[in-house]
Amino acid sequence: MNTTVTYTFGSKVAEAAPVRTAVPDPLLFASVDGLAASLSNSECVFQPRGTGDTHVMTHHVLQALDKCREFRSLEEHAARIAAMTPGLDASPAGIRRVLDNLVARGLLVSNEDFVARMRVAGGLGAADGDGDSSLRAICIRACDRPAQLARLLASLAEYERVFRMTRPYVLIDDSTLAAAADRNLDLLREFARSTGCKVTYVGTTQQQQVVQRLAKTLPSSTDALSRLLLRPRGSAAGAFGGGRAWNLALLMSAGGSLVLLDDDLCLPLRRPDDAESGIDPDPSSVPGTSFYRSMDEALNSAAAIEDDPFALHLGAVGKTLGRLVAEPAFAIDPARLRGLNLGRLEHLRGDARIIGTVQGTCGSSRTESGAWLYQLDPESREAFWKDRESYLRNIEATSIRYGRRKAHVRAISNFTPFAIDNSRLLPCTNPVGRGEDSLFSVLASICRPESLLLELPVAIGHIQESDRKRSLRTTSAPPPRFNYFLGDYIQRQIPEILAENPADRLQTLAVGLRDVAGASESRRIRLLREYLAYARAEAIERLQQQYESAPNAPIYWQADVRSIIEANGRALTTNAPPRLADWPEDGDEASCARRLGEDTAHMAEALEAWPSLWERARQLGERFIGTD
């Protein structure tokens, strides 16, 4: 442990604390996050997070340090401290000397040092994974939509014609109609004939064979395997199960990387004209949204990229953030740190690893509700409500372009990753229900806390199979789905997990979920009511903030915002059973408690079994993908 001497205002700095020479004002500085404890009425001890150092200082100095959380020049910090610290008796020069001393101690970090340390921590000489060379397959999730699959395969055939990569493709077919499954298989075979690519079809029969193969070596995981990968017997044809194909794709690519596509997507990727190079470090920045009159106009709203779209994404996954920001295309401009709180940039660690890439959408929104349209950034919001005619079209989000202008990194995303680094253990997701992508992201942040997702300033085409009235779901304000509840519960209620090994972390998380499943019926009911009250209150607060921030908004937008607030308010005050959106509408309190117990127990069982399943799949390697 390294202990440093006391810092005070209005006194000479001790000889043992060498002061850094005057720093040019263009540099920006922010204070590190840490823990403090009082020693006396005048002194305290401060320990930065992640170090064993302790620093003794006066309470006035600690207050000054607390006022330097955002990246600003030392002159700006000095002026702010003088204006906002009551009882401070120090000259500007004295304040500046203390700030210089804090810089020397490493308690104030410059923007340039922050970025430089990121590159060093990323290990510029270390060997990162090469997502492109370790690609196991481009996995396509398909169901009863042959027309959508035909469009996607046509765009992939054009990609292969241009780039001649003959990449491997796997079609994971969840179709319930025999005719649709047969048509999907025919389309895949025709794609293979026209491109020369290796293809693998994984339909119901092949999925059962995978379960049987893994169950032979891991018999204790048979029940979990069936739930993770197979459609439940007697389930409705329309029961959504995107997580089943997701889990199968993760097993098929264990030890390598994969690309995950849905059958209603299509190439090429498009980059907006105002896209910028580099990474935006602001954690509060949000993607922008543009609105168009038709699907065709939205699909062609930006120029197609000239690069290999898969190489673009695969070239990033598996790298540390430090290695990534050393590349000009992903550099972080230190000047863009101005005004950002250093404590909110903890995810920007040089040794953090990119486990997946995310991109925007042109065409239809990939959400089932339009609630997000009432949380747009000011520029997008102006386009959203431009006039009543376009507004009535825009609320359905059927012809939009959504995405970023500049790359961005984050720990959790609500959208399906495009490329995934699966060279090290990643978690499964819930095999049933919507929101499986968001839940996977939360689980990955627990399993691999050093991981990040990279959002790229490109968009992929999305053409839904039929028109959706998202506005009806928006204004009715339905309850959240189970996967969103589970993700929120894990982030807010599960205690910090200290284990380093990803498999151990999943086991610990499973214990927390079994704790929910084992709670009394009354406690589970109370848990659901508390969560629904929180979700409703948060939605109301955010909408109120939007409403109050736009006093001159069109009356039709204001009316809809009030309507959504009122719908959430009615749901907040009602005494109805605490139902989540995936559960039967006629269920009573007891049935809701029972479903919560069953669903959390099943997810716990899946997390317990998953590490062994993933490792066995990794050992099988190419033989796993070749299952027929």
Predicted segments with their positions:
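Terminal low-complexity segments of carbohydrate-biosynthetic enzymes
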Residues: 1-20, 60, 66-67, 71-72, ...
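Long, charge-rich, low-complexity alpha-helical segments
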Residues: 2-9, 42, 50-132
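Long, low-complexity, charged/polar intrinsically disordered regions in eukaryotic proteins
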Residues: 2-52
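Short, acidic, metal-binding catalytic loop of nucleotide-sugar glycosyltransferases
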Residues: 154-166, 190-194
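Active-site-proximal specificity loops/subdomain of glycosyltransferases
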Residues: 180-256, 272-273
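Short beta-strand-to-loop acidic/aromatic patch adjacent to the donor-nucleotide binding site
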Residues: 256-268
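Conserved donor-nucleotide/metal-binding helix-loop-beta segment in metal-dependent transferases, i.e.
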Residues: 267-348
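Acidic donor-binding loop at a coil-to-helix junction in glycosyltransferase catalytic cores
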Residues: 434-439
